[in-house]
Amino acid sequence: MEAFRTHTGIGVPLRRSNVDTDQIIPAVYLKRVTRTGFEDGLFAAWRNDPSFVLNLAPFDKGSVLVAGPDFGTGSSREHAVWALMDFGFRVVISSRFADIFRGNAGKAGLLAAEVSQDDVELLWKLIEQHPGTEITVNLQDRTITAGTMMVLFNIDDYTAWRLLEGLDDIGLTLRKLDEIEDYERHRPEWKPHTLPA
């Protein structure tokens, strides 16, 4: 997983609350066996509307989604995070995330930045009045900057550390590779062994 330090990209206003994982990517798009190629299913029902924000320039090139409260509710669907990332999003900003979505996002490298709803409203106003406004998100400082506006965001320390280090679950496991190999070397012969890489 690529480490996340800072990201600058066009802000996209998604003025919707309670966006669940089935709205992010409907179940019909979950039949792939790979982890990529899900961008075509992102907000599929809404993208049929030509006036939907992701169908409008410059928002169609955005990488920082500014969403309403309770983003990512519903089922635990890693595909929702993958679809957002496949489309090009690196950050989702909201006043409230579903716990499971927040966890899936952090494990995949998507930053879920939590701010107050007042700050969401100010960001929406700014990027709607000035389409193409770039938003810079600095994970180290936990700041979001857009134009003259600067706000702090919340993220738990553990998820922030994983993102800064670029550690997904496999990366975390590989940090203990010497200990794992030592354990395997000292296991009794009659117990099952893992095959060497």
UniProtKB/Swiss-Prot annotation:
Which keywords are on file for this protein? Amino-acid biosynthesis, Branched-chain amino acid biosynthesis, Leucine biosynthesis, Lyase
What EC number(s) are associated with this protein in UniProt?
Answer: 4.2.1.33
GO annotation, biological process: L-leucine biosynthetic process
Q: Does the keyword Lyase apply?
A: yes
This entry carries the following GO cellular component terms, namely:
3-isopropylmalate dehydratase complex
Per UniProt, what is one GO molecular function of this protein?
A: 3-isopropylmalate dehydratase activity
Q: Which SUPFAM superfamilies match?
A: LeuD/IlvD-like
Catalysed reaction per UniProt?
(2R,3S)-3-isopropylmalate = (2S)-2-isopropylmalate
Subunit structure, interactors included: Heterodimer of LeuC and LeuD.
- What is the name listed in the Swiss-Prot or TrEMBL entry for this protein? 3-isopropylmalate dehydratase small subunit
Record organism: Mycolicibacterium vanbaalenii (strain DSM 7251 / JCM 13017 / BCRC 16820 / KCTC 9966 / NRRL B-24157 / PYR-1)
